From Swiss-Prot:
Family: Belongs to the universal ribosomal protein uL3 family.
Record's subunit section: Part of the 50S ribosomal subunit. Forms a cluster with proteins L14 and L19.
Gene name of the encoded protein: rplC
Protein name per its UniProtKB record: Large ribosomal subunit protein uL3
Alphabetical list of HAMAP family matching this protein: Ribosomal_uL3_B
Length: 217
């Protein structure tokens, strides 16, 4: 069986109680339904993968090349497309074009990796962006309390090294949180309750995949 995955929408966080009446913070993810639109093979594409689509969209907003891809698969256009890489070509036997994937691809207690786009913070200084300590609050410090300090030498090296941590745009990055636990699968509502927090804003697109470091299938 190939490594499983599904596209979904982060709905927000809540809390539930486990069998020991302990409070468990969970993130609610509307998982799917996804539809398989293409299966890639090494002979034709050079690698093994399955392409899945998710989300409603007006056909008028889809360009003709993409519309042709959906028509070839025999499905209505969807808003989002993603690929799940497969370990080997034999894993593609678990999928077929037009197949629908729902939250039931996962089970209670499964370990997953969740990928999303982190919240944008705008332009941020080094204390917020990189956790710099800042400078003294007193003892002669004047108007430098949140400044980063020196960014390098003078004549030597005569330049600023690449990768030097500075102020700049913070957030809106592709982030993956690994080894989260699926607390419960609500198949009736197509919802996953994932223990803990996941990246991104409410309403954001997320990809939920089997945890790679645990060898989940």
């Amino acid at each position: 069986m190939a490594r499983k995955g599904i596209l979904g929408t982060k709905l927000g966080m809540t809390q539930v109680f486990d069998e020991n009446n302990k409070v468990v913070p969970v993130t609610v993810v509307k998982a799917g339904p996804n539809v398989v639109t293409r299966i890639r093979t090494p002979e034709r594409d050079g690698y093994s993968a399955v392409q899945i689509a998710y989300g409603e969209i007006s056909p008028r907003k889809v360009n003709k090349p993409v519309t042709g891809q959906f028509a070839a698969a025999g499905v209505n256009p969807r808003r989002h497309l993603a690929e799940l890489r497969l370990d080997d070509e034999s894993a593609a036997a678990d999928y077929e074009v037009g197949q629908e994937l729902t939250a039931e691809v996962f089970s209670d207690g499964a370990y997953v990796d969740v990928t999303g786009t982190s919240k944008g913070k705008g332009f941020a200084g080094t204390m917020k962006r990189h956790g710099f300590k800042g400078q003294g609050a007193a003892h002669g410090a004047q108007a430098v309390h949140r400044r980063p300090g020196s960014i390098g030498g003078c004549a030597t090296p005569g330049r600023v090294f690449k990768g030097t941590r500075m102020s700049g745009r913070m957030g809106s990055d592709r982030v993956t949180t690994q080894n989260l636990v699926v607390h419960k699968v609500d198949a009736a509502n197509g919802v996953l309750l994932i223990k803990g927090a996941i990246p991104g804003r409410n309403g954001g697109l997320v990809m939920v995949r089997s945890a790679i470091k645990r060898g989940e299938k």
